[in-house]
Amino acid sequence: MVRIPLQKSTENKAEKMAQITEKVDVCVIGAGHAGCEAALACARMGLETVIFTVSVESIALMPCNPNIGGSSKGHLVRELDALGGEMGKNIDHTFIQSKMLNASKGPAVHSLRAQADKAEYSRRMRQILENQEHLVIKQAEVCDLLWDDVNADAVSGKSGATKKIRGVRTFTGTVYEAKAVILCTGTYLKARCLCGESITYTGPNGLQAANHLTDSLKEMGVAMR
């Protein structure tokens, strides 16, 4: 009777997992407001799109501000609405209170603001993503950006060397080859929660932070603060 070492079997399995490669048109990293709109826009143009989130429970989550519209970002919501975006439609179905700000002043500064049912807003947006053709949701942490060093003349017409993105790699080693990568990481990159002198390394609302992608961005030459 011959016994096969478990360690060797596990290593072979891990090696096979690391070799898994999928090809898509666009990778969107992050599933907040920006990520959802970017992924939907790409998918609706017929591009095979995958959107990554550290947790499907955090899709369109609003841990800091449950309002849509208002003086600061109301114009962005209206622009998205004009371009076929989903944020304005979703808040119409999930708001619990709305108010016209600056109503006592001139119409130039009137600004509609709606307060969302956070749980319902997130649930409905997730449903929209799941039902969208050409769009797949992946619960995974993207750790590395993959790129090639190419001659800038071939990309922008300028002389010198530059980098051309070719995909991403997740924490489990799966590679997604893509023609474009859209970063919508929000406040998750090496996130910290400060409470007085106490520092907790965590993402918003106690969710997992993205602790590896920052290093990949730095390696690519992107300045990080």
Task: Kindly label every feature range from the protein language model.
Residues I4-L6, N12, K16-K23:
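A short, basic/flexible loop-to-alpha-helix module at the beginning of a structural domain
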Residues V26, E48-V50, K179-V181:
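Beta-sheet entry/capping signal
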Residues L40-W147, T172, C184-Y201, Q208-L213, ...:
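Conserved N-terminal/central alpha/beta ligand/cofactor-binding core
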Residues L146-T174:
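Conserved beta-strand-loop-beta-strand element in the redox core of flavoprotein oxidoreductases
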Residues E22-V24, R169-A180:
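Core beta-strand elements of the Rossmann-like FAD/NAD(P) dinucleotide-binding domain
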Residues I20-A34:
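Beta1/beta-strand and adjacent pyrophosphate-binding region of the FAD-binding site
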